[in-house]
């Protein structure tokens, strides 16, 4: 009888011990980080499908060291420029070769989105395969050479009949926005194709090879604004920003410059109307509302996605981020995690009618084949 009682007591003690151990393990598990991803000693390759010096390159090189500080393990983030094909070359390479271990990311621009939206034959990538962790809206400024003799948008019509040259990455790149804008204003411009990025276009402008240009806000603020004081650039207009109702407003980063709809009214004497303007606005939204983004490749594990999302969120929520980013990116709200995913879903939603109209325009105007 005593033996039986002793066995019962021993069993009870064992069960109690096991329960306590399980509770301890559970406690430790709950106390552990949500994701155990650690990139200590690793090297992240950030593909930027544009040449050095343009808006996307400037944007990526600004973000890289800041995000690195917030990624588990603080890996070095190295920007790798792969220009070509209006950014399709680098995006195709990412789609084909990127590993899903969190060490390969892609930075896209509107010039990557437009060929995708238009069904460009060079596109072998699919945004639906990727996961966005950051969406950066931006603006853009159109400017001209002082040699053209105008001082503001009010004098734009005096450029009609003059030989205007614009260095372009391609008609299906983000350059679609300025090229269509000038066409709507009845201002003829010769597009010189073959640029590897907007940075190359800006350098062509600085060398005097072309006399009109546009840059996204990041490159404009950093690379072009200093030239205004030197008398080498005349700012004409910004593209503007969209308010909550989808109406164009002046870009708060360039409040003294009229936006495109204002310039339309200056030139045509009436408010914007017609299919061409509607299509311009649709592609402006697609190219600028979520203009640049950081993407992880297909098959990336959720814990790696979470680690990157958390790192980007910490970066943009830092106390000094707004001050630092205004000098490089302008004052635009950054969308992260789920908001970034939603931003790109909206930006890549173009109606079939708008797509068909612009494809026909590109074929007629620039002999683009689809």
What is the meaning of each model-derived region?
Residues 240-245, 260, 313, 317-346:
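Mature extracytoplasmic/periplasmic domains
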Residues 18-29:
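Bacterial N-terminal signal peptides
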Residues 45-63, 83-86, 167-173:
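Extracytoplasmic "Venus flytrap"
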Residues 1-14:
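N-terminal secretory signal peptides that target proteins for export/translocation
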Residues 30-36:
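Sec/Tat signal peptide C-region and signal peptidase I cleavage site
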Residues 37-40, 69-74, 93-104, 113-209, ...:
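Hinge/capping helix and adjacent helix->loop/strand transition within the periplasmic-binding protein
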């Amino acid at each position: 009888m005593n033996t039986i009682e002793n066995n019962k007591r021993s069993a009870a003690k064992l069960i109690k011990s096991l329960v306590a151990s399980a509770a301890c393990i559970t406690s430790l598990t709950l106390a552990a980080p949500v994701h155990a991803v650690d990139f200590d000693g690793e090297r992240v390759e950030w593909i930027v499908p544009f040449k050095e010096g343009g808006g996307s390159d400037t944007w990526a090189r600004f973000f890289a060291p800041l995000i690195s500080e917030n990624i588990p393990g603080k890996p070095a983030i190295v920007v790798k420029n792969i220009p070509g094909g209006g950014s399709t070359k680098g995006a195709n390479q990412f789609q084909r070769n990127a590993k899903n271990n969190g060490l390969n990311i892609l930075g896209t621009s509107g010039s990557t989105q437009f060929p995708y939206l238009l069904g460009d034959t060079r596109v072998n990538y699919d945004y639906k395969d990727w996961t966005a962790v950051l969406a950066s809206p931006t603006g853009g400024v159109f400017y001209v050479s002082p040699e053209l003799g105008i001082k503001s948008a009010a004098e734009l019509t005096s450029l009609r009949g003059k030989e205007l040259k614009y260095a372009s990455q391609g008609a299906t790149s983000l350059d679609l926005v300025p090229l269509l804008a000038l066409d709507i204003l009845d201002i003829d411009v010769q597009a010189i194709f073959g640029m590897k990025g907007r940075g190359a276009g800006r350098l062509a402008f600085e060398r005097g090879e072309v006399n009109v240009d546009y840059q996204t806000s990041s490159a404009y603020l950093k690379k072009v604004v200093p030239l205004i004081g030197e008398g080498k650039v005349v700012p004409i207009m910004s593209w503007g920003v969209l308010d909550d109702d989808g109406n164009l407003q002046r870009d708060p980063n360039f409040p003294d410059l009229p936006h495109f709809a204002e310039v339309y009214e200056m030139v045509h004497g009436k408010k914007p109307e017609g299919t061409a303007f509607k299509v311009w606005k649709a592609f402006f939204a697609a190219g600028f509302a979520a203009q640049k983004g950081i993407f992880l490749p297909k098959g990336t594990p959720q814990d790696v996605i979470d680690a990157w999302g958390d790192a980007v969120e910490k970066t943009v929520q830092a106390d000094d981020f707004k001050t630092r980013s205004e000098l490089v990116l302008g004052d635009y709200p950054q969308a992260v995690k789920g908001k970034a995913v939603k931003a790109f879903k909206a930006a890549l939603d173009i109606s079939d009618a708008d797509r068909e109209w612009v494809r026909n325009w590109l074929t007629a105007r620039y002999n683009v084949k689809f």
